[in-house]
Amino acid sequence: MSETTNDNYGASSIKVLKGLDAVRKRPGMYIGDTDDGTGLHHMVFEVVDNAIDEALAGHCSDIIVTIHDDNSVSVQDDGGGIPVDIHPEEGVSAAEVIMTVLHAGGKFDDNSYKVSGGLHGVGVSVVNALSDKLQLTIRRQGHVHEQFYHLGEPQSPLTVIGETEATGTTVRFWPSSDIFAITTFDYKILAKRLRELSFLNSGVSIRLIDKRDGSEDHFHYEGGIQAFVEYLNKNKNPIHPKPFYFTAEKDGIGVEVALQWNDGVNENVYCFTNNIPQRDGGTHLAGFRGALTRSLNSYMENEGMLKKEKVATSGDDAREGLVAIISVKVPDPKFSSQTKDKLVSSEVKSAVESAMNEKMQEYLLENPADAKIIVNQIIMAARAREAARKAREMTRRKGALDIAGLPGKLADCQEKDPALSELYLVEGDSAGGSAKVGRDRKTQAILPLKGKILNVEKARFDKMLSSQEVGTLITALGCGIGRDEYNPDKLRYHHIIIMTDADVDGSHIRTLLLTFFYRQMPELIERGYVYIAQPPLYKVKKGKQERYIKDADEMEQYELTLALDGAELHISTNAPAMNALVFEKLVAEYNSVQKLIGRLNRHYPAPVLQGLIYQSPISIEMMKEESAVENWGKSFVEQLTAKETEAHQYSVRTQFNAERQVYEAVITVRKHGIDTDYFLNFDFVHGNEYAKIVSLNKQLNGLLEEGAYVIRGEKVQPVRSFEQAVEWLVKESRKGLEVQRYKGLGEMNADQLWETTMDPNSRRMLKVSIKDAVAADQLFTTLMGDEVEPRREFIELNALRANLDV
């Protein structure tokens, strides 16, 4: 645990290690890979680590991470706020020193922070150096201070912009597209790490908000890694009530372990060093496994169980159904690479091994009832392993395969290089037939799967092996299965493509196959070998013309193109037609804003958002005058009331934002006698979404005059608004349009299947990846496990998001 030893954390506590140019020259050394997204997300974690350090020192309890609509990220904490006084050596504010000098911060001054969670990091200055723009907001000593930076250079001194009683720091940054190949943040990657941090730092509240699509999570767990294990076992059946937990220190190394067995067959062990996850384990995992096997074996030996049961157990049996977290605190850890995926510090193995051995033996002796349950499960696992071995031998002896050693249903390809070979797993024999005819025989193999394959989430290993469809699949893949025989390097195809129908059964079969790969061959997903084919959703016919359409977005685009084909907009009775390109661009922008309104609908009612398109814009400058905001609000409410068709009543008032020194409009909507307030606050008016609405507003305002009309073909339609013009054109274009929704692959002939789904030059595929292993594990357990209640909750929670095709 961190402790603060000096309350005077100010400018003089900040220790400086200089040199920021090196960061821009070799960003990969400081932040990780700038091409594959790891460095980009590390930027967020670097800022979050600073807030976590504040929390560990007892200064902060709430951290809010927001992905904004413009792909910037802000990290806000309610800590003490970065010091704003002038630094004695540097002559500028301490905040500016922290933001512009490499490795500057209170973590290097032993009196301010005794233990630092973010010490492995490189400081927020690196984030600043690699951002096109960074906005720093500090709430401290009654004032709000703000400063902007560009690629690490301050654009102005730290300035007081408002007053506040709150304290804390907000860092918002826009990563530089010149440095990062990808600048789009992935919600799942951030959620995975923030969830880990909230468990590893018990009691810290971390909120993650995605303004792009409204996703939101709140990670707040008391109970540390013990709670983490309980969370991982949620929706599973733990076989003993309370997780085994201990914390110890050996030779200056802190060891913390929590574990609990469930009645499943999968092992889930997560390792951390100084809060950093090791995907590939390392010396702490080796020490843990060695001690676990040894202490359990010695217990079973002493109790005479192995003799009585006549069974030989292995370490793998002991880890069946095991969920464990190993967290070590090491003063100077050594990793196998820059990514810190594997710990190689040799002293950690003996520290973990001796602590684990001692505590596990104590636990087994002090909890005989739990020990008996655990040991019985291990003995059952050993028996199942033996049964599976016999089943495999039996299969070999029976010669269930054809002469080539491959299943008869498999139509193999000629190519022998796995990197160039593709295996299509096709639902049903009819689609399998079309695929076999339509494929490229050189590189594409087809394996039709009949009916639904076994749900491996619920089945024991020996039952799984006796399933015909699973057996066929394992043989075709060629990489074996089970701990003794599985070798992903022997895989015969590096593109395994799941191709199922676009109906409920197809989705179920796809989920069953994904469950199989995730539980039995996770390396194939990790190596990027598993794909999902994306056959077209629609076939549209207009007259004699036919075309395939991939998804709803493309359908919308197609309808728009059709609507504008030969269409003309005349803005008044005698005006010539608007330029076709200008009209098309305006319609595209209008549609983009309509989608934006759909997204914002969770926060503001649609009539208010639609009204903003036609209301003269409000600016930050206007918001400095209360009377200007009042007048704007009155005019807006009049416009809303005039358009009102439902029983809604609107009113407006203003509120003062002391932090920003501006007046904000508050729109009150009364519906069925209930008042709801909607705040058009500084952040909204200053944000990207409102900027897009204003841009459209400027183009539409006063565009149509008296007598405006739209023409399409022979038809003429008078219109009063641009919205009316677009709606009429789309409605007209749909006349005579036949839309066929594809549900089965068998509905396409071989040529159509090749052209739309299998031709490498034109097909679209989704690559299956696991960005958040914990969330993936939870989802597979919820959807495919034994427990019905969590599945019902999941359906109730997500029912409204389902896209029904009735």
Curated annotation (Swiss-Prot):
Residues 421-536 form the Toprim domain. The keyword Ribonucleoprotein does not apply. GO terms for molecular function: ATP binding; DNA binding; DNA topoisomerase type II (double strand cut, ATP-hydrolyzing) activity; metal ion binding. It holds the Pfam family GyrB_hook. It catalyses: ATP-dependent breakage, passage and rejoining of double-stranded DNA. Belongs to the type II topoisomerase GyrB family. This is DNA gyrase subunit B. It comes from Haemophilus influenzae (strain ATCC 51907 / DSM 11121 / KW20 / Rd). The gene is gyrB.
